[in-house]
Amino acid sequence: MPKGPKQQPPEPEWIGDGEGTSPADKVVKKGKKDKKTKKTFFEELAVEDKQAGEEEKLQKEKEQQQQQQQQKKKRDTRKGRRKKDVDDDDDGDERVLMERLKQLSVPASDEEDEVPVPVPRGRKKAKGGNVFEALIQDESEEEKEEEEEKPVLKPAKPEKNRINKAVAEEPPGLRNKKGKEEKSKGKAKNKPSATDSEGEDDEDMTKEKEPPRPGKDKDKKGAEQGSEEEKEEKEGEVKANDPYAHLSKKEKKKLKKQMDYERQVESLKAANAAENDFSVSQAEVSSRQAMLENASDIKLEKFSISAHGKELFVNADLYIVAGRRYGLVGPNGKGKTTLLKHIANRALSIPPNIDVLLCEQEVVADETPAVQAVLRADTKRLRLLEEEKRLQGQLEQGDDTAAEKLEKVYEELRATGAAAAEAKARRILAGLGFDPEMQNRPTQKFSGGWRMRVSLARALFMEPTLLMLDEPTNHLDLNAVIWLNNYLQGWRKTLLIVSHDQGFLDDVCTDIIHLDTQRLHYYRGNYMTFKKMYQQKQKELLKQYEKQEKKLKELKAGGKSTKQAEKQTKEVLTRKQQKCRRKNQDEESQDPPELLKRPREYTVRFTFPDPPPLSPPVLGLHGVTFGYEGQKPLFKNLDFGIDMDSRICIVGPNGVGKSTLLLLLTGKLTPTNGEMRKNHRLKIGFFNQQYAEQLHMEETPTEYLQRGFNLPYQDARKCLGRFGLESHAHTIQICKLSGGQKARVVFAELACREPDVLILDEPTNNLDIESIDALGEAINEYKGAVIVVSHDARLITETNCQLWVVEEQSVSQIDGDFDDYKREVLEALGEVMVNRPRD
């Protein structure tokens, strides 16, 4: 049988046979030979193994060289030599890149119009966009945002290297073909961005290089990997040297703001060491303010004050009219004292013709008698007296020209009231509690509180245009407060007072300045009038807030988002404001309207637990005589008792023994004769004027109550909160609390003791007005006995206390009310009581 045609062999034996495929990359079927080289499969394998071994050897040598280079660069970095080399290399690369970008860019005039220009056939079209000019323009911005750009650009670098790496590994023919296609695509673009231009430049530079020779691809790959490692190493060193590399953008901005504030504080320290913790800014003086520079009124607009990084005043306005008496009120710690200090130091723009005095420091302790310390405050009078003495000496020597000058000096002395100066000084000192012997006593023999009274007497004697008093009643007894209250009601110059004594503010002030929300708000009338107006204002604000919230709720129900609803509401407020502004064209522009916030009332409530009933008398002194060693007795034959419903206020001048009487009642002092008797079940709660001595300063308020009364943590915090201690202060060491906060801790301790009798020695010191009101309400609701020593007239009158006067070594009850006692005190000093009606 004839044989059929011979079967054709299968299709091409070579896999991947193409234009750019090297013989080494061809795959041969088992048992076949290459028609060109006539090599067997095993010979091909041997050749490949040999080439692979050589390449592996070269690769190892390259890696060793790279490791040596990296170690050398690390050593150079330690020695500080590497930075110069890197900068030189970077400068060279940057110059090459800039020259390349300059060739690709067009003039700036072409960049403005960007009208496409027809290109003649056969010519290349210039690339659009002036990349070089754009880089020059943004160079400073890129330097500023270098830290922010790094996280964005870092992932792009490996991608760029991968592109170059892929181009290097592609066959030469395919790479050239692909490069032509990419080049033609680049011509079709009119306005490439700076990033695209950089990419095209990298590709063009890659194309211009010679095609890689066999066996060089891996070398190039290794070199590129080495350069990539160097770049990553540089970035790692930058991050290691940058202490803020781990911070986010928000944290960096916050840190920058804090550093700016610290620099501002440092500059302020250099300028004025007295105000080293404060920052003040004030708007430029307007034309209206410039007109008032020579007037007696003060008008400061748009000033801001910050202390320790905390903003106290923001765009606030200060208006003070000559001859008015202002009371500055507001919660503790909001900047009232800071404002007084800035006015006194003229950190704010006070008119130069207004002399300002802030009474805040006690007089120097020296040999100067108290009355002379007051008289020497009037430097003009002292200068005239010295001139008088000098001219009298010249006149005695026969100088006739001195007579005319001496007459002028006498006229000035009469005009200033120099003859009555000493009588005036002694009257002021007597009103503040100095008897004739004390007025002639050297100041170094007085305590700090009495030297503070001398300082207050100096301020009253000088009568500045603007007198500022910061808590003037804190160092005074009730009698001195009564005299000062009456004296200031006749003050004819401008007065600015910070005080927590509501009765004092009601009697003295004609206007109230309320510090609220970092601004100053003004009310005509005394504190009682302000309180009514403020409460009415808060009610109106609450109604407006509820109306606003209702409108926002309706807008949200209609499909608006919260942001859209708030924006629409603000637009309505803006239109209303513009309408009002058109009606009142004379008024200055107001701040842009903001959405209302819920009004928050500052409320404090004190509570003391009611005691169980006890049979009277629960406490008393019987036949008691007491005196300190080496001194005459303070009391002789005291005999009185106290019941559970007693409300007693002990009054009298300083030094007569009011605090000593309280210590005898509590059993802390033992009588010289007689005895203190009390019910065996009686528990006494004592608030000492030196209350800080009974606290453990290293403990927190919560720990102090937990240890003393075995209270759970939450119960201790609730007790502290009831007496107005802020929650953040519950876990702070007591030594770091303010005086008012420490006082609240003591009141919380008294409540935990569940006393049957409250004995309070000057409890209103360091308390604000709201807390004093809360204390008065708590005393009225308390079912036990109360004995109090206080200089706060309103606390005395609000609690309906009986007045017991300490005088002449005994204690006696007054027939009449508090006004009767005031009249007696003023008559004893030779003063006439001012009966100014309260508004």
Swiss-Prot record:
Main location as per UniProt: cytoplasm
Organism: Rattus norvegicus (Rat)
Gene of this entry: Abcf1
Function: Required for efficient Cap- and IRES-mediated mRNA translation initiation. Not involved in the ribosome biogenesis.
Residues binding ATP 2: G652, P653, N654, G655, V656, G657, K658, S659
The protein, known as: ATP-binding cassette sub-family F member 1
Modifications the protein undergoes after translation, according to the UniProt entry: Phosphorylated at phosphoserine and phosphothreonine. Phosphorylation on Ser-109 and Ser-140 by CK2; inhibits association of EIF2 with ribosomes.
Record PTM Phosphoserine, positions in chain: S22, S105, S109, S140, S197, S227, S589
Location of the protein in the cell: Cytoplasm; Nucleus, Nucleoplasm; Nucleus envelope
Biased composition (Basic residues): 29-39, 71-83, 247-256
Residue ranges of the region described as Disordered: 1-258, 553-600
Keywords noted in UniProt: Activator, ATP-binding, Cytoplasm, Nucleotide-binding, Nucleus, Phosphoprotein, Repeat
One Pfam family linked to the record: ABC_tran
Residue intervals of the ABC transporter domain: 298-542, 619-834
Subunit structure: Interacts (via N-terminus) with EIF2S1; the interaction is independent of its phosphorylated status. Associates (via both ABC transporter domains) with the ribosomes.
Acidic residues: bias regions: 136-149
